[in-house]
C-alpha cells in the first residue's frame, strides 16, 4: 500500500508544491484503502488536507468521471489527482504487476480522459 502514496507525494515534492499538497498526496488513498477514517484525519491534519482527502476518496456509487469533475474546484485535490494519474499511468509498473495488455489499454484510456477533465477549462 505505501509505495504508491509515497510516489505520489514524491511527484508533488519534486514539483516543489506546498506542504499541504504533499501531505494530501501521501494520504490520498488512506480512507479508501485502510481502516483510517476521515474523522481521525481531521483530528491530526489541517482542513486543507482533509478536505482534499475527502474529495479524493472515491465513493464507488459515483461515476468515476463525475468524481474526477468534482475534484476540479479544489486546487490541492486536483494537483494530487494529476500526480496520482501520472503514477498510475506508468505502464512499466503495470507490466511488472502482471497486468494484461487489455487492462493496460483500459487504464491508459481511463486515466487519459480523467487528465483531460482535470486540465479542461
Descriptions of predicted regions:
Residues 1-121:
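Active-site helical microenvironments for divalent-metal-assisted chemistry
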Amino acid at each position: 500500500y505505501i509505495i504508491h502514496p509515497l510516489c505520489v507525494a514524491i511527484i508533488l515534492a519534486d514539483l516543489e508544491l506546498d506542504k499541504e499538497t504533499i501531505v494530501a498526496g501521501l494520504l490520498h488513498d488512506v480512507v479508501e484503502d485502510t481502516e483510517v477514517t476521515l474523522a481521525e484525519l481531521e483530528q491530526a491534519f489541517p482542513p486543507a488536507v482533509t478536505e482534499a482527502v475527502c474529495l479524493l476518496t472515491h465513493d464507488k456509487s459515483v461515476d468515476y468521471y463525475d468524481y474526477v469533475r468534482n475534484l476540479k474546484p479544489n486546487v490541492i485535490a486536483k494537483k494530487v489527482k494529476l500526480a496520482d494519474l501520472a503514477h498510475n499511468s506508468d505502464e512499466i509498473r503495470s507490466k511488472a504487476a502482471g497486468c494484461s495488455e487489455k487492462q493496460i489499454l483500459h487504464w491508459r484510456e481511463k486515466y487519459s480522459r480523467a487528465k483531460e477533465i482535470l486540465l479542461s477549462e
